[in-house]
Amino acid sequence: MNQQPTFSIITITYNAERWLERTILSVLSQSYPNIEYILIDGASKDKTVEIIKQYESGIASWISEPDKGLYDAMNKGLKLATGDYVWFLNAGDTLYTADTVQRIVASLKKKVSLPDVIYGETRIVDAEGRSLGMRRLKAPEKLTWKSFRMGMLVCHQSFISKREIAPLYNTEYRLTADYDWCIQCLRRSKRIHNTRLILSNFLEEGLSSVNRKASLKERYEVMCKYCLLYTSDAADE
């Protein structure tokens, strides 16, 4: 097993000057060396690009150009990634501590081969980075794709996939392509590793009531696609 895998951490931005620096610093301050940091900006009109340029020496690659939405931008990041793993951390989100990636790698030491998916817990923070407590949905001890019939049990920012099994995001979904993507990654996985660690701080921005309804509708469509309304984890044993 490769004892020192490379993590491609991808940050998507658009007019993110308020939060971007803390996200960048949380990645660049990691004690683990094998990190490929990629930023995809959607042609921001504020100082986002200036901030990116300020830290350019620590960034493997970045682009700033118009996109067709969040998931189109995420697909651009996937196409640029070359690491063993891909991990999305968007503007305002941060890695939990400066040794988070090092601790993930340490948790893999006894593994015969690298897992296909790595996951953990998530802490919620406000716009100022202050803790609001742990995410309401706790990551399950054992995770399968069928676990997602109960919703987004693992926050996207604490879900890490091997690049070789990670598909592009389905841009037909406007709000829940990440839910669909995680299910696809898990369906392609043979080895899934629970780190039992807090991996990320997730910026809680909240959905409008209109977007919340649209998100639930899309999630229902994804669940129907994978027959998640009619299955159980027991069927996966």
Residue ranges of predicted features:
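Conserved donor NDP-sugar-binding/catalytic core segment of glycosyltransferases
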Residues: 98-132
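Conserved nucleotide-sugar donor-binding catalytic segment
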Residues: 120, 134-218, 222
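Short, acidic, metal-binding catalytic loop of nucleotide-sugar glycosyltransferases
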Residues: 26-34
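Glycine-rich, basic loop-to-helix element that forms the pyrophosphate-binding segment
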Residues: 65-81
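Short aromatic/hydrophobic "clamp" motif used to bind/position activated sugar donors
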Residues: 86
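A conserved acidic beta->alpha catalytic loop
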Residues: 41-49, 90
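Conserved small/polar residues in nucleotide/adenosyl-binding loops
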Residues: 230-237
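N-proximal low-complexity "stem/linker" segments adjacent to membrane-targeting elements
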Residues: 1-26
